[in-house]
């Protein structure tokens, strides 16, 4: 990730915040949505500068759809709204953590979280094959 390329879409994001962001080659940063009161990770979306600006100023999560090439506000179609409680950058300024109050399902499958269907390692499992322990 690099901080030099600017997104091709116009943005009203505060210049100081924009200068700190390290974006992918296509001008995006991953945005993790986390339930503010439980800490449960809900989903991963993508934001460009304008999506982050809209998220910071409207109190609702706005993402950039890589497949559709357009902005989408979580819940506008489904009713499964994400109300923003806080927004933070990670230590490298290449990922955004958005703590939200999720109404309904976060996942497009209808599940509350996108991270519950394909668990690769569970609590209590060491992750090390039995022969190697």
Curated annotation (Swiss-Prot):
- In the UniProt record, does the keyword Transferase occur? no
Annotated residues for binding of Mg(2+): 90, 92, 94
Q: Name one Pfam family in it.
A: PRA-CH
One annotated GO molecular function is: zinc ion binding
Cofactor names: Mg(2+); Zn(2+)
EC number from the UniProt entry? 3.5.4.19
Q: Can you state which reaction this protein catalyses?
A: 1-(5-phospho-beta-D-ribosyl)-5'-AMP + H2O = 1-(5-phospho-beta-D-ribosyl)-5-[(5-phospho-beta-D-ribosylamino)methylideneamino]imidazole-4-carboxamide
Q: In which pathway does it act?
A: Amino-acid biosynthesis; L-histidine biosynthesis; L-histidine from 5-phospho-alpha-D-ribose 1-diphosphate: step 3/9
Tell me which GO cellular component terms the UniProt record holds: cytoplasm
Q: Name one GO biological process term.
A: L-histidine biosynthetic process
Presence of the UniProt keyword Amino-acid biosynthesis in the record: yes
Annotated function: Catalyzes the hydrolysis of the adenine ring of phosphoribosyl-AMP.
Q: How does it assemble?
A: Homodimer.
Q: Which PANTHER family match?
A: HISTIDINE BIOSYNTHESIS BIFUNCTIONAL PROTEIN, PHOSPHORIBOSYL-AMP CYCLOHYDROLASE
What family does the Swiss-Prot or TrEMBL record give for this protein? Belongs to the PRA-CH family.
List the protein's name.
Answer: Phosphoribosyl-AMP cyclohydrolase
This protein's species is Streptomyces avermitilis (strain ATCC 31267 / DSM 46492 / JCM 5070 / NBRC 14893 / NCIMB 12804 / NRRL 8165 / MA-4680)
